[in-house]
Amino acid sequence: MLLIFQLALFAFIVVSFLLVVGVPVVLATPEGWAENKSTVFSGIGIWFLLVFLVGILNSFVV
């Protein structure tokens, strides 16, 4: 269970970093928002899923 928690936490950190870097880049490019809106929303959805997954797994690890 600890390994699953660590992998979920690592995925959360990676997705968070990608969103912190990627969203401003998308918004800064001309027509970037119109072309990449679904990608940004997918990343945000994955981020929220990982937040809840890490929270649930944390209750089993501790």
Curated annotation (Swiss-Prot):
The keyword Transmembrane helix applies. One of its GO terms (cellular component) is chloroplast thylakoid membrane. Its main location: plastid. It is a multi-pass membrane protein. It comes from the Eukaryota. GO terms for biological process: photosynthesis; photosystem II stabilization. Belongs to the PsbZ family. PSII is composed of 1 copy each of membrane proteins PsbA, PsbB, PsbC, PsbD, PsbE, PsbF, PsbH, PsbI, PsbJ, PsbK, PsbL, PsbM, PsbT, PsbY, PsbZ, Psb30/Ycf12, at least 3 peripheral proteins of the oxygen-evolving complex and a large number of cofactors. It forms dimeric complexes. This is Photosystem II reaction center protein Z. It comes from Chlorella vulgaris (Green alga).
